């Protein structure tokens, strides 16, 4: 049990640091490793709670930059995706095959992020289907694997590419809203137990410390460097999930 708690502290600390410094990444980093110890459902619920805590910590500093205009359709679509993922997770969340699917999805995201960083997409190309489709994807994969933030980041980069403070603030407010919604659904369904409370109590300390440290580096360290390191970790974790789950 002691080693399990130390493991959670370490990976959550790294994930929260990445989230604080670059705006996203906690879900990717932690979900790449936590399923080695817990089921996918248990891992997802923990990471969703950590995401909500991290987002709230970051928002305390950046709340003045929140501007939800342009995100309403995205958020509504995300809620729809969260409802769908809730039924999938509660039905298949304890199956080991879901860990393999998670590994494949993580590697796919890493490849997508690598090539997407080389492209420069204009906001003028966005139509109404973009926030709806990205919102549903964010909601579904965020609720299923707690790693849907990539779709949120892509959309917010379109909207706030010239203002990194507004970008990170709006990513966090949407993350807080959608994560809290998923946790509410699972809470009503009775999916939490005492072990969850123990893991959360230990991990939330790492969340706060990691997010605060990440925010300090937010102004100094290139976000691209932090994301690159995080993506390498996620790539290795995804391969491990496929090969050894």
Predicted features by range, described:
Residues 56-65, 101-126, 215-216, 238-245:
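Transmembrane helix exit motif
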Residues 67-73, 91-106, 119, 220-228:
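Loop-to-transmembrane alpha-helix entry segments
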Residues 212-234:
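Interfacial loop-to-transmembrane junctions
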């Amino acid at each position: 049990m002691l080693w399990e708690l130390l493991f959670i502290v370490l990976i959550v600390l790294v994930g929260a640091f990445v989230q604080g410094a670059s705006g996203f990444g906690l879900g990717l980093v932690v979900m790449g490793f936590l399923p080695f110890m817990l089921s996918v459902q248990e891992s997802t619920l923990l990471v969703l709670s950590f995401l909500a805590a991290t987002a709230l910590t970051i928002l305390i500093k950046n709340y003045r930059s929140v501007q939800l205009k342009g995100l309403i359709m995205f958020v509504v679509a995300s809620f729809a995706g969260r409802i769908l993922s809730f039924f999938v997770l509660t039905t298949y969340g304890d199956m080991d095959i879901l860990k393999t699917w998670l590994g494949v999805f993580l590697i796919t995201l890493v490849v997508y992020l690598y090539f997407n960083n080389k492209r420069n997409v204009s906001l003028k190309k966005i139509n109404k289907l973009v926030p709806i489709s990205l919102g549903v994807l964010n909601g579904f994969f965020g609720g299923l694997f707690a790693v849907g933030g990539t779709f949120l980041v892509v959309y917010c980069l379109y909207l706030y590419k010239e203002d990194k403070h507004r970008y990170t603030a709006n990513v966090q407010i949407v993350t807080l809203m959608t994560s809290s919604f998923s946790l509410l659904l699972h809470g009503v369904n009775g999916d939490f137990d005492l072990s969850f409370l123990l893991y959360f109590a230990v991990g939330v300390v790492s969340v706060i410390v990691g997010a605060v440290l990440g925010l300090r580096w937010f102004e100094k360290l290139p976000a691209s460097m932090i994301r690159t390191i995080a993506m390498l970790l996620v790539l290795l974790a995804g391969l491990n999930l496929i090969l050894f789950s």
